Amino acid sequence: MKQYLDFLRLVKNTGTNKTDRTGIGTTSLFGYQMRFDLSDGFPLITTKRVHLPSVVHELLWFLSGATNIKYLQENGVRIWNEWADKNGDLGPIYGVQWRNWQNVRGESIDQIMQVIEQIKNTPDSRRIIVSAWNVGELENMALPPCHAFFQFYVALGKLSCQLYQRSADVFLGVPFNIASYALLTHMMAQQCDLEVGDFIWSGGDCHIYSNHTKQVEIQLARTPKTLATLKINNKPDSIFDYNFEDFEFINYVFDAYIKATVAI
């Protein structure tokens, strides 16, 4: 995806050297946006391999409302291991906030069900929003939400989604996050009998970790290939009933995996 490589190059060439919580150090750029027309193909980068089982299983896990890594580990997904406690728990992260946000009266709000109802019944609403940034529970989360806030938009029979990501690990995290929310947009569109429109990714602190510099150079030397196509082979009664096997990524051609260490 040229948009992503242009972004990666811009951060590398114009970013500011900054310290960070992990102690590794970053080259950082504040504020950037990319737009992907989902009808042109699925926005899965081709200049390195993305581990699709991790993308799909993590999204299904979020949608289930779970915050224990047991399901992920059972399906060979280890991306949350470093943050979990000895029992595998992560505190009230994405799954809880998406499906079980507690209001001041102690009532549970299922934000995913709420936005589905809005898309179906009030598609012109400017309030079709899911937030994972629950200020009152941040201190209890293993990691505060990086992809914190997303909004849906309906026009001309198409569903679009915009994500705001407050903290963006441009080399490791962003390709994964783009794929995850593009997949969610496809699922929501199918459930609401709409076509897919655009996915817009908006980043706050967009950074390349100092220990990813060589990997970035390798990736920038590669040439993007034609995007894959997503085929959803089943339409369950609920967005919560999809299975991993329901998703087929057709003609995903990619360059070799580039190993890099995640900052903890």
Curated annotation (Swiss-Prot):
Its EC number is 2.1.1.45. (6R)-5,10-methylene-5,6,7,8-tetrahydrofolate binds at H51, D169, A263. The active site is at C146. It catalyses: dUMP + (6R)-5,10-methylene-5,6,7,8-tetrahydrofolate = 7,8-dihydrofolate + dTMP. The keyword Methyltransferase applies. It is found in: Cytoplasm. Keywords: Cytoplasm, Methyltransferase, Nucleotide biosynthesis, Transferase. Transmembrane segments: none annotated. Pfam families: Thymidylat_synt. GO terms for molecular function: thymidylate synthase activity. GO terms for cellular component: cytosol. GO terms for biological process: dTMP biosynthetic process; dTTP biosynthetic process; methylation. Its main location: cytoplasm. DUMP binds at R21, R126, R127, R166, S167, A168, D169, N177, H207, I208, Y209. Pathway: Pyrimidine metabolism; dTTP biosynthesis. The keyword Zinc does not apply. Catalyzes the reductive methylation of 2'-deoxyuridine-5'-monophosphate (dUMP) to 2'-deoxythymidine-5'-monophosphate (dTMP) while utilizing 5,10-methylenetetrahydrofolate (mTHF) as the methyl donor and reductant in the reaction, yielding dihydrofolate (DHF) as a by-product. This enzymatic reaction provides an intracellular de novo source of dTMP, an essential precursor for DNA biosynthesis. Belongs to the thymidylate synthase family. Bacterial-type ThyA subfamily. Homodimer. This is Thymidylate synthase. It comes from Ruthia magnifica subsp. Calyptogena magnifica. The lineage of its organism: Bacteria, Pseudomonadati, Pseudomonadota, Gammaproteobacteria, Candidatus Pseudothioglobaceae.
